[in-house]
Regions:
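Short beta-to-alpha loop/turn elements within the nucleotide-binding domains of ABC transporters
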Residues: 1, 16, 56
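A short, Lys/Arg-rich alpha-helix, primarily the initiator
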Residues: 1-13
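Residues within the helices of the helix-turn-helix
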Residues: 8, 19, 48
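Alpha-helical residues within the helix-turn-helix
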Residues: 12, 23, 52
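Short alpha-helical DNA-recognition segment
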Residues: 15-34
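DNA major-groove recognition helix of helix-turn-helix/homeodomain DNA-binding modules
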Residues: 45-59
Length: 59
């Protein structure tokens, strides 16, 4: 499973839209979409915020 697939799975599991997640991370919805489709990757700060938000470790 890619990082993007994990983000998408965790996001949908929490019932969040891409816009909801983007607002929580203070990024654009397009950024979230690009992460989920593998067109880009979040920076370390955002990865840490994602881990905290979803209650997972960064591994």
């Amino acid at each position: 499973m890619t990082l993007g697939e994990k983000i998408c799975t965790l996001r949908t599991g929490k019932g969040l839209s891409q816009e909801d997640l983007a607002a929580k991370l203070e990024v654009s919805r397009q950024s979230v979409s690009k992460w989920e489709t593998g067109q880009s990757v979040p920076d370390l700060e955002k990865i840490i915020k994602l881990a905290d938000l979803f209650g997972v470790n960064v591994d």
